[in-house]
Regions:
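Conserved small/polar residues in nucleotide/adenosyl-binding loops
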Residues: 1-5
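Class I S-adenosyl-L-methionine
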Residues: 8-14, 20-145
C-alpha cells in the first residue's frame, strides 16, 4: 500500500488473495491497526474462518460480513474496523462470522458445514474443538442465533 499520511485513505480494499496474505498485508501497514484507522473491506479467496479469527484476535471488529456466491463458490465480503478490543472467538463464530444476518446466510452456512466432516478427521476426539464440530454436524443450532 502506498499511503503517505495517516488518514489519507478512509477505506482500503483487499480482495482476491488468501486470508493469510490479507493479514500479512495488514501487518505491513501498522497505521491500519490504530484507532480511527481506515475501514478494511476484504474478500478473501480462501480461509474465511481464519481471517475472521485473526481480525478478532488483533483488535478488529466486523462491521459487516456478507456471504456472496459467484462462479459456484461462496465468498465472504467482510468490512472491519480497528477498535483495539481483542477477543478470542469460538470455532463456530469464526466459521460463520456475521453471515446469518443476510438472506444468503443459510446457503453459506450449508457450504461451510459441508466441509466439516473432512476437517473433523484431523481433530483429536475429546477436545473442545471436536465437541464444537460434532455439535455442528449433529444439526444443533449453529449460527442462526
Amino acid at each position: 500500500m502506498c499511503i503517505r499520511d495517516r488518514g489519507e485513505a478512509g477505506t482500503i480494499v483487499l480482495a482476491g488473495v488468501s486470508a493469510q496474505t490479507t493479514w500479512e498485508i495488514i501487518e505491513k501497514a501498522p497505521w491500519v491497526s490504530a484507532p480511527g484507522g481506515p475501514r478494511l473491506v476484504m474478500v478473501p479467496a480462501t480461509r474465511h474462518s481464519d481471517l475472521r479469527r485473526w481480525l478478532w484476535e488483533h483488535g478488529f471488529a466486523l462491521a459487516a460480513d456478507r456471504p456472496v456466491q459467484a462462479a459456484g463458490r461462496w465468498y465472504a465480503v467482510m468490512a472491519a474496523e480497528y477498535t483495539g478490543e481483542v477477543r478470542t472467538p469460538t470455532f463456530t463464530e469464526c466459521l460463520f462470522g456475521r453471515t446469518a444476518e443476510w438472506p444468503e446466510g443459510a446457503g453459506y452456512a450449508a457450504w461451510q458445514k459441508a466441509k466439516l466432516p473432512r476437517f473433523r478427521l484431523g481433530v483429536p476426539d475429546g477436545t473442545e474443538l471436536a465437541e464444537e464440530i460434532d455439535k455442528l454436524l449433529d444439526g444443533s443450532p449453529s449460527q442462526t442465533r
